[in-house]
A protein has these predicted regions:
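Conserved RNA-binding domains used in RNP assembly and mRNA/RNA metabolism
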Residues: 3-104
Length: 104
């Protein structure tokens, strides 16, 4: 059995290894989503994130002719494979892109 590499000796990681790792993370995230979706009242999609939340407030704002959206979410869960804790008390999002809010 081979142990870990000696300090200062990097082990090459292939693109396939990275892809398999990210696929495993994505599958784990999907399973977590499936387990928690029933705890929430809303699905919120922005151009950068996907959220579950129990309270959502969307305000349409303008500034210098530009239209943007301010979102406030309470008691939320964030779809993000790189976050160690996906449950958050509150989220504030400002976006110039489309926003989709659906009641579950």
């Amino acid at each position: 059995m081979r142990g870990p590499p000696a300090p200062g000796h990097d082990v090459p990681v292939s693109a396939e290894d990275i892809e398999a790792y990210e696929n495993d993370l994505e599958l784990d995230l999907y399973r977590e989503y499936r387990d928690v979706v029933s705890l929430f009242s809303y699905v919120v999609e922005t151009e950068r994130r996907f959220y579950l939340a129990n309270a959502v407030d969307v305000q349409v704002r303008t500034n210098g002719g530009e239209v943007f959206f301010e979102l406030s979410l309470e008691d939320a869960w964030v779809w993000d494979i790189y976050r160690s804790s996906r449950f958050v008390k509150s989220v504030h999002v400002v976006t110039f892109k489309d926003v989709n809010v659906e009641e579950l």
